[in-house]
């Protein structure tokens, strides 16, 4: 397990089981304290700035309660055809999103904020993902698994959707939900490790 300097704790400001799993696999000791902040994309807001803003808002919200600990806030968005695709509102929305991804390359951006005593680092990681053509029947079958309903862009690259991923440029773990190598570098730079 990683040991942290300064005797401080590490908090993940997210309820995402995928983010928790990635941190655990990286042998980081942390606790989960989900942040509850509005996730509203304003018209004209750059997608990367949007991801950074949400990550910062989440980290700050939790850091305000635990000022002596380090907090990781993150937000992942999918951008296809200049449209930000967040978590689908319902099955019809999920189908719409998957049709946008089908046969195209899109970007997945995660904003990450590390907040702690006298430290705030905010960065983004962007990965390009290419998806094969997906038939309407395949889309319906995929949606009925329930897998896309709690994920940005209506898919999980680590699950059934992987059968349609034909290429990836960048950090795979970013697409899962947390660019763990970037988080590690941020923690080193902040003196946490």
Curated annotation (Swiss-Prot):
Keyword Cytoplasm: yes
Superkingdom in the source lineage: Bacteria
Cofactor section: a divalent metal cation
Positions annotated as active site in the UniProt record: 75 (proton acceptor)
GO cellular component: cytoplasm
Enzyme kind, highest EC tier: hydrolase
Catalytic activity: dTTP + H2O = dTMP + diphosphate + H(+); UTP + H2O = UMP + diphosphate + H(+)
Subcellular location: Cytoplasm
UniProt cross-references to NCBIfam families, sorted A to Z: maf
PANTHER family assigned to the protein according to its UniProt record, in alphabetical order: BIFUNCTIONAL DTTP/UTP PYROPHOSPHATASE/METHYLTRANSFERASE PROTEIN-RELATED (PTHR43213), BIFUNCTIONAL DTTP_UTP PYROPHOSPHATASE_METHYLTRANSFERASE PROTEIN-RELATED (PTHR43213:SF5)
Similarity field: Belongs to the Maf family. YhdE subfamily.
HAMAP family for this protein: Maf
Function (record text): Nucleoside triphosphate pyrophosphatase that hydrolyzes dTTP and UTP. May have a dual role in cell division arrest and in preventing the incorporation of modified nucleotides into cellular nucleic acids.
The name this protein goes by in its record: dTTP/UTP pyrophosphatase
Species of provenance: Koribacter versatilis (strain Ellin345)
């Amino acid at each position: 397990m990683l040991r942290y300097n300064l005797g401080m704790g590490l908090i993940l400001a997210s309820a995402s089981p995928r983010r928790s799993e990635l941190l655990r696999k990286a042998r980081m000791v942390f606790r989960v304290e989900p942040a509850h902040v509005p996730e509203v994309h304003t018209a004209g807001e750059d997608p990367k700035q949007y991801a950074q803003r949400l990550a910062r808002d989440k980290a700050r919200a939790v850091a305000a309660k635990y000022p002596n600990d380090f907090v990781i806030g993150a937000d992942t968005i999918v951008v296809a055809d200049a449209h930000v695709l967040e978590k689908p509102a319902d099955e019809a929305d999920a189908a719409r999103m998957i049709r946008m991804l089908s046969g195209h390359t899109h970007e997945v951006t995660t904003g990450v904020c590390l907040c702690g005593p006298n430290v705030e680092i905010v960065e983004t990681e962007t990965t390009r993902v290419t998806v094969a053509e997906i038939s309407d029947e395949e889309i319906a079958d995929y949606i009925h698994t329930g897998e896309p309903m709690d994920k940005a862009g209506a898919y999980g690259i680590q699950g059934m959707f992987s059968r349609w991923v034909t290429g990836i440029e960048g950090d795979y773990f970013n697409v899962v939900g947390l660019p763990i190598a970037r988080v590690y570098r941020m923690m080193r730079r902040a003196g946490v490790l």
